[in-house]
Amino acid sequence: MTTARHPRPPEIANASLEEIAARYVARYRDRKADWAAFEDAKVEGYKRAQHRFIGAGGSGKHADVNVVPPRGFTLSIMYVEPGQGNAAHTHEVEEVFFVLQGYLTAFIQDESGRRIDIKLGPWECIACPPGVIHGYVNDSLEPVYFQVMLGKPRPDTMGYADEELYRRRDAHLKEDAR
């Protein structure tokens, strides 16, 4: 006999192992590439696809029923082609970029515009603290796949450093609702 030393959350207190596996396993083959996950993804140079696994990440698409319900963090896989990336932004929580395949240039930036680029390869990562302006670009010759984790189950949408993008940061959600 084995003993669970911690209680299950109320919503799965009486669930079978099969029910738990059905709700808490996510497979890449079942993920849909979302090329409109973020407002800046409409802009050339920022086009990328989010594959949501746990929660919505910084996309704000919290109604996605095809994801594992988030408890303490989110997890997505990003696909970024050469020459693309994302706009400089902040979050209210830590964000991690962990490269799986390919090469990525992550950056951190201060409010004066000073920027430091960090080249990342497979199995390398950067943890971006809350409130620190950051982002990435794929300046290599091949696509890159990397994990993105945010340290909260329902983080706010991206806090773009650019004023116009920030003003429209939720517009992609309104378009999805139509």
Regions found by a protein language model. Name each.
Residues M1-R71, E164-R178:
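A short, N-terminal "cap"/entry segment at the start of jelly-roll beta-barrel domains
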Residues A56-A63, T74-H91, P130:
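Conserved short histidine dyad/triad with adjacent acidic residue
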Residues N66, E111-R115, E142:
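Short, solvent-exposed loop/turn segments that connect beta-strands within catalytic domains
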Residues G72, I77-P82, T90-D110, M149-K152:
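Short, conserved beta-strand element in jelly-roll/cupin
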Residues L75, G85, E94, R115, ...:
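A structural connector/turn signal
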Residues N86-H89, A106-I108, C128, H134-S140, ...:
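Short beta-strand His + acidic residue motifs that chelate non-heme Fe in jelly-roll/DSBH
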Residues V96-F98, A127, L141-Y160:
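A short hydrophobic beta-strand segment most commonly corresponding to one strand
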Residues D110-P130:
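Short acidic-glycine-tyrosine-enriched beta hairpin
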